[in-house]
Regions:
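Feature targets compositionally biased, intrinsically disordered low-complexity regions
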Residues: 4-7, 30, 75, 137-139
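Histidine (H) residue identity feature
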Residues: 7, 16, 67, 107-110, ...
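N-terminal regulatory/effector-sensing and dimerization cores
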Residues: 26-131
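OB/S1-fold single-stranded nucleic-acid-binding modules
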Residues: 1-19, 26
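Short, Lys/Arg-enriched, Trp-marked, Pro/Gly-tolerant hinge/linker segments that flank
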Residues: 128-141
Length: 141
């Protein structure tokens, strides 16, 4: 069975890291794991990042280092080549198997948030379920 989520050994494989990054994993009220992981590699192994198992979850990624001309992929195809700027946050929908070509040093803080965790927060707050979040790569906030 494929491991879901974006933390631990899985993120090590995806980003071709030498060491497994530490992750803070929290369990939401509905028993869903939410994780925060810092990744950094000053001398990365070049190549396309590993395959993400499609799931109904999001990665909120705060970029801590510039990454110019980032070749971004979805569903096995290059879809954009934006300049990533430190201090900018990006949202990735894991249903679209996001990936990128690793060819430069990188440093990011990733938050793995399953859609069911967002639904639980909405339910607990008496709000409508979130549904689909609009993830337009290359447009940070």
């Amino acid at each position: 069975m494929a491991q879901s989520g974006f933390h631990g050994e899985k993120i090590k494989e995806l980003l071709h890291l030498r060491d497994t990054p530490s992750s803070l994993i929290m369990r939401s009220v509905r028993g869903v794991n939410v994780a925060a992981t810092e990744t950094r590699d000053d001398n990365p192994v070049p190549g396309l990042s590993g395959r993400i198992v499609p799931e109904d979850a999001y990665i909120v990624s705060l970029k801590l280092r510039d990454y110019p001309d980032c070749e971004y992929w979805e569903n096995g195809k290059c879809v954009a080549k934006p300049d990533i700027r430190a201090g900018t946050t990006y949202l990735y929908d894991m249903k679209y198997e996001p990936g990128f070509v690793i060819e430069k040093p990188f440093h990011s803080l990733h938050f793995y948030v399953p859609a069911s965790a967002l639904d639980g927060i909405a339910e607990q707050s008496g709000a409508r379920r979130v549904g689909q979040l609009d993830c337009q790569y290359g447009t940070g906030f």
